């Protein structure tokens, strides 16, 4: 990770650690960098946070001042920006969002011309420019100043693309959607309605501050209750920028990213679509997923946490599906990043083609009890690398053996240490997680 850019772009609290000056300089640099030998063409999307508009204006000012033409997709999912960039010849795209974080935060994700997340070396150049380590970039003058275009059409093309990927009509299927008061509000219902589903929506009225607030994929209990109360066949919950999806079956049971990888991986293998007979996961995936994939004779790869790393592995080895437990799922044939609505459509495809309820299709997946603690710390690197913390984690690992595991890692987006334990029961998970938390507290790492 760099000084400003983490695993998922430049993220921070609006007007504190991420400012309009930062956004302006990002725009200035990108307009110059991509416009050295031609007039750069940049697409911008945003989520529903109040500050997203502020950052949009700053980015536009910086980009156009450097001579780039800017095309505004307005409120739209992150994957739609990737789709528009790669399918319509843009030099790069920018998504203004802090994903699943609360409304006070925001972020700037840059997507290169191939629709992929920006290369680390270019992120480093942007950081150097922000810090004044690169000479001042020249301004454009006269007719060379960039123009700004309303490009809602790009989002509508993305919606049409999603609809075209469905293999069957959804007619008669009752689907619940938790839109997290975020980017999915401009896309998801329209897609499901067009495919014939009976669509029921919650949290679809953004007001600038209610994004992710007790809703969406980080508060899946809301959708669980809704699906059961309304007697729905299935439900889908998205995060603020709709690049991740979790599902709920007809019984109200949560289908997380691991379950989605298992469901779709098995289905793709049956159809001869699982390249290299491999599913790409991250180190946070449940031990039960690996044992269940073993039982189906499906291989797997493990990467660092972040869909960026999942996609890099998929590209390097030619794998066709990968993702994270949190619901970032990448279908390499159709997308270059996690896409929540696309993931929903793929789950629907499995359910309709197999003619079974999702609860039935997942009955052979055995997930270990898992506890994940997010511990706010003073300095996440110092906490993670503290010898006593490492020793406590090692002791737990030895005691669990093959019957569980522990993972202690620093968050890529927050000042947090994540302690994850999997074991045979919730009580055992809590016991071993507490062993590490006690050491973190004793050593003064935990924020007061």
Swiss-Prot record:
Activated by phosphorylation. GO terms for cellular component: cytosol. Mg(2+) binds at residues 99, 239, 241, 243. Keywords: Isomerase, Magnesium, Metal-binding, Phosphoprotein. The modification Phosphoserine is found at residue 99. The active site is at residue 99. It holds the Pfam family PGM_PMM_I. Its EC number is 5.4.2.10. It is an enzyme of class 5 (isomerase). Binds 1 Mg(2+) ion per subunit. InterPro entries: A-D-PHexomutase_a/b/a-I, A-D-PHexomutase_a/b/a-I/II/III, A-D-PHexomutase_a/b/a-II, A-D-PHexomutase_a/b/a-III, A-D-PHexomutase_C, A-D-PHexomutase_C_sf, A-D-PHexomutase_CS, Alpha-D-phosphohexomutase_SF. It comes from the Bacteria. Its cofactor is Mg(2+). It catalyses: alpha-D-glucosamine 1-phosphate = D-glucosamine 6-phosphate. GO terms for biological process: carbohydrate metabolic process; peptidoglycan biosynthetic process; UDP-N-acetylglucosamine biosynthetic process. GO terms for molecular function: magnesium ion binding; phosphoglucosamine mutase activity; phosphomannomutase activity. Belongs to the phosphohexose mutase family. Catalyzes the conversion of glucosamine-6-phosphate to glucosamine-1-phosphate. This is Phosphoglucosamine mutase.
């Amino acid at each position: 990770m760099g000084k400003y850019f983490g695993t998922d772009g430049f993220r921070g609290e609006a007007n504190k650690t991420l400012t309009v000056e930062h956004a302006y300089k990002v725009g200035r640099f990108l307009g110059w960098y991509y416009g050295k030998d031609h007039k750069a063409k940049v697409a911008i999307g945003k989520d529903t946070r109040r500050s997203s508009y502020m950052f949009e204006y700053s980015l536009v000012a910086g980009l156009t001042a450097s001579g780039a033409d800017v095309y505004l997709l307005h409120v739209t999912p992150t994957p739609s920006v990737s789709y528009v960039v790669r399918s319509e010849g843009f030099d790069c795209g920018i998504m203004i969002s802090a994903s699943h974080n609360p409304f006070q935060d925001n972020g700037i994700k840059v997507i290169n011309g191939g629709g992929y997340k920006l290369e680390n070396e270019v992120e480093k150049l942007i950081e150097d420019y922000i810090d004044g380590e690169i000479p001042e970039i020249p301004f454009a003058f006269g007719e060379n100043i960039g123009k700004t275009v309303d490009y809602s059409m790009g989002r509508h093309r993305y919606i049409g693309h999603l609809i075209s990927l469905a293999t069957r009509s959804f007619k008669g299927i009752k689907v619940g959607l938790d839109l997290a008061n975020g980017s999915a509000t401009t896309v998801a219902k329209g897609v499901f309605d067009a495919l014939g589903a009976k669509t029921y929506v919650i949290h679809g009225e953004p007001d600038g501050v209610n994004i992710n607030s007790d809703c969406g994929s980080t508060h899946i209990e809301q959708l669980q209750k809704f699906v059961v109360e309304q007697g729905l066949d299935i439900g889908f919950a998205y995060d603020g920028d709709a690049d991740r999806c979790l599902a709920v079956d007809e019984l109200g049971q949560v289908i997380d990213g691991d379950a989605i990888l298992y469901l779709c991986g098995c289905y793709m293998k049956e159809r001869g679509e699982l390249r290299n007979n491999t599913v790409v996961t991250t180190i946070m995936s449940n031990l039960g997923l690996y044992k269940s994939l073993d039982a189906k004779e499906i291989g797997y790869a493990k990467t660092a946490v972040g869909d960026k790393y999942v996609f890099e592995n998929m590209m390097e080895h030619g794998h066709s599906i990968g993702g994270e437990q949190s619901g970032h799922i990448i279908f390499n044939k159709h997308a270059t990043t996690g896409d929540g609505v696309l993931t929903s459509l793929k789950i629907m495809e499995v359910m309709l083609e197999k003619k079974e309820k999702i609860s039935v299709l997942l009955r052979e997946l055995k997930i270990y009890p898992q506890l994940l603690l997010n511990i706010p710390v003073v300095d996440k690197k110092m906490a993670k690398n503290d010898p006593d913390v490492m020793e406590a984690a090692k002791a737990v690992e030895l005691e669990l053996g093959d019957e569980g595991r522990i993972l202690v890692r620093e968050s890529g987006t927050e000042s947090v240490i994540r302690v994850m334990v999997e074991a045979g029961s919730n009580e055992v998970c809590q016991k071993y997680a507490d062993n590490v938390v006690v050491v973190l507290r004793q050593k003064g790492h935990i924020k007061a």
